[in-house]
Regions:
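RNA pseudouridine synthases
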Residues: 1-169
Length: 169
């Protein structure tokens, strides 16, 4: 109902909602965990894209932690403290570890033959979309005032990519 929706929206506005995402990125960040505090704004030349904009951007903060490493890739948990458009994608790309298949921010498609260290083959990519997943959400229930949390399982395509990365470590 409207009052409940308003209370939840207010929590987002006040940054009281805790969100975490899982991303599969190229390479492994230098630090196991860190805070990225880089302001974001619309890209100066490409209107559909966002970029680090120190002088004119809005505050954007993301905490990340490397959960698992593989040959050439990592599974990273990201906890945005602000809610800017494309925030996680831009921040990870800025670290030089773009999200797999995120072509807008430097991520490449990954093919099974690459992971298996085999000869190039004509195959479909393991995942054809940005390997980013909204994993958990926590907020105060609008009527009971109890903290509630929700977890969404990995989509099949991301799980398949993780399975292959684990197999071909």
């Amino acid at each position: 109902n409207d009052p409940a929706q308003w209370k939840i929206a207010k929590q987002f506005e006040l940054r009281q909602v805790k969100k975490s995402y899982l991303a599969i990125v190229h390479g492994t960040p230098e630090l196991q965990a860190d805070r990225i505090n880089m302001p974001l704004g619309i890209h100066p030349k490409i209107r559909e894209k966002y970029a680090i904009r120190p002088e004119v951007g809005k505050e954007a903060v993301t905490f990340y932690e490397v959960l698992e490493t593989f040959r050439g890739f990592s599974l990273v948990q990201c906890k945005p403290q602000t809610g800017r458009t494309h925030q996680i994608r831009v921040h990870l790309s800025h670290l030089k570890h773009p999200i797999v298949a995120d072509d807008m921010y430097g991520g490449k498609l990954v093919y099974p033959w690459q992971l298996a260290d085999a000869e190039p083959a004509v195959e479909e990519p393991v995942i054809s979309r940005c390997a980013l997943h909204a994993w958990t959400l926590e907020f105060t229930h609008p009527t009971t005032a109890q903290r509630v949390s929700f977890e969404a399982p990995l989509p099949a395509d991301m799980q398949h990519l993780l399975d292959l990365l684990r197999r071909y470590r």
